[in-house]
Amino acid sequence: MKPSLVLKMGQQLTMTPQLQQAIRLLQLSTLDLQQEIQEALESNPMLERQEDGEDFDNSDPMADNAENKPAAEVQDNSFQESTVSADNLEDGEWSERIPNELPVDTAWEDIYQTSASSLPSNDDDEWDFTTRTSAGESLQSHLLWQLNLAPMSDTDRLIAVTLIDSINGQGYLEDTLEEICAGFDPELDIELDEVEAVLHRIQQFEPAGVGARNLGECLLLQLRQLPATTPWMTEAKRLVTDFIDLLGSRDYSQLMRRMKIKEDELRQVIELVQSLNPRPGSQIESSEPEYVVPDVIVRKDSDRWLVELNQEAIPRLRVNPQYAGFVRRADTSADNTFMRNQLQEARWFIKSLQSRNETLMKVATQIVEHQRGFLDHGDEAMKPLVLHDIAEAVGMHESTISRVTTQKYMHTPRGIYELKYFFSSHVSTSEGGECSSTAIRAIIKKLVAAENQKKPLSDSKIAGLLEAQGIQVARRTVAKYRESLGIAPSSERKRLM
């Protein structure tokens, strides 16, 4: 084939750096956005914070934003949004025209409580390990701190350090004593009984139950630290030592027969065991709390739901008018070119923030419009909602809705929820309507809470009760919803009354 030159006309979509920035800011959480803003303030001298009460004579493109507009009202079938407008700082021949809109579319918890065991004492000066522990401290460091306060020989201290290294985050000894003993230098001539003796000393450390080799020993160690006058102490020790498997399987009739106690007595023994902590190490190695900052605040005024941005979450920015005034339009020096580029970047950054706020406001308002039943009555009134519904309502692509609802939170009178929480699939009803999966989960939770604990509801029975309410759900679907709620099967929910 003979080579030739051909002239064609075509269109190609190019994602500009400004568009990439707008998309990136849109998908950031509030905490990440605050960090992004701080980095922008540090790197761009043209950007600065706008303090409350300051008047910049329209020098700030964000001065006339949603903060100064009334909150969006959601009532009946109509709603109004707060709009955001921005004025350019100055119009120069060298500056690019900024568009008005940025196209951004592209099984133990059921038996035992996890709280720490309560050790009553009449001595007000008794040392309390909880007063010393701090967030982020590991269980090993806490045990080593106590080890340094205990008088021991050098050999015993070496054994103790090795044992502490073998204790996992839950407080249990992971390796057997034989394996630990075999790991020492033969020249030290350390015997198995020495290792076990040091382990018994570590088991006296706080938190109570640490260093146990199994669940029964963990509970027994905690029982031994309770006052001897504690009611049902003897029976509780026997229960965790000899019949822990029967307790786990909830074979209460077998427990009463083998322990030779009545049902009421067994219930009191189990209540004592339930006050213990099966994971003593979790008292120290608790995960750091995750903080969220709501992006949107929803409140009710009479019969109307009002939607507004959380203005305290994101600082207001403006272009520094003094630095902007130094930019000379005709000057082509390197310094002036740098300042001109920084000014343009500052304007685009502010514009991207403005676009993010507008999109977030539109989406949040539509969510509240669709889920007013939830706000008024709770989870059982949640309606089916998918991304396409909101995308169609606000005239945006589903990918944009997905970005703006990820890691964005709404503060409501019922609590703080991620925007994605309000989206759920639907299940058909016998009357031809639809019910959201969130509402079904709420109904299942309500049914289980009201069940007879001596005869808990099976998944099939729950499916039958839902069908009686006109909701057609298979037993396997009920099991899936139940597991997502952290509810154990009926065989594990059986209780002694």
Swiss-Prot record:
Alphabetical UniProt keywords: DNA-binding, DNA-directed RNA polymerase, Nucleotidyltransferase, Sigma factor, Transcription, Transcription regulation, Transferase
List the biased-composition ranges (Polar residues). Answer: 75-86
Q: Which GO terms describe its cellular component?
A: DNA-directed RNA polymerase complex; protein-DNA complex
MF term (GO), any: transcription cis-regulatory region binding
Keyword match Transferase = yes
Q: Which InterPro entries match?
A: RNA_pol_sigma_54 (IPR000394), RNA_pol_sigma_54_core-bd (IPR007046), RNA_pol_sigma_54_DNA-bd (IPR007634), RpoN_core-bd_sf (IPR038709)
Tell me which PANTHER family the record gives.
Answer: RNA POLYMERASE SIGMA-54 FACTOR
Which protein, by its recorded name, is this?
Answer: RNA polymerase sigma-54 factor
The protein's organism comes out as: Pseudomonas putida (strain ATCC 47054 / DSM 6125 / CFBP 8728 / NCIMB 11950 / KT2440)
